Amino acid sequence: MRRPRVEILYFDGCPNHEAARALVERIAVELRVEPQIDLVDVPDAAAAAQLRFLGSPTVRVDGRDVEPGADERGDFVFACRVYPAERGFSGQPDAGWVREALSRAAA
């Protein structure tokens, strides 16, 4: 089983990256996967554009955003990220997306 690389891109001041990290860690334990988790601090709008940052937190597994379709987006922004959720919106990605991305990467 391979060891996936998980990047959690965030900026100081947005509180959701810790919850996103906890989500990734919880799902990794469930799947018995040991990802390399890197926290990537995005310092400003210029870095946001360079890193193709869709907001904080952005979770990527092996370079791909866990949100389906997000890799095609171009609305890079230095702001908190809002994810579509079953009941409105959430400040972290859907657990199913994270599970799917980690499973695929570890295979």
Which ranges hold each PLM region?
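Local sequence-structure signature of Cys/Sec-based thiol-disulfide redox active-site neighborhoods
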Residues: 1-31
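Thiol-based oxidoreductase modules, predominantly thioredoxin-like and allied folds used
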Residues: 34-46
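Short, well-ordered secondary-structure micro-motifs within conserved domains or adaptor modules
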Residues: 38-41, 57-61
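Acidic pyrophosphate-coordinating catalytic loop
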Residues: 46-52
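Structural micro-motif
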Residues: 52-60, 72-77
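Non-catalytic, surface beta->alpha helical segment in thiol-disulfide oxidoreductase systems
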Residues: 64-106
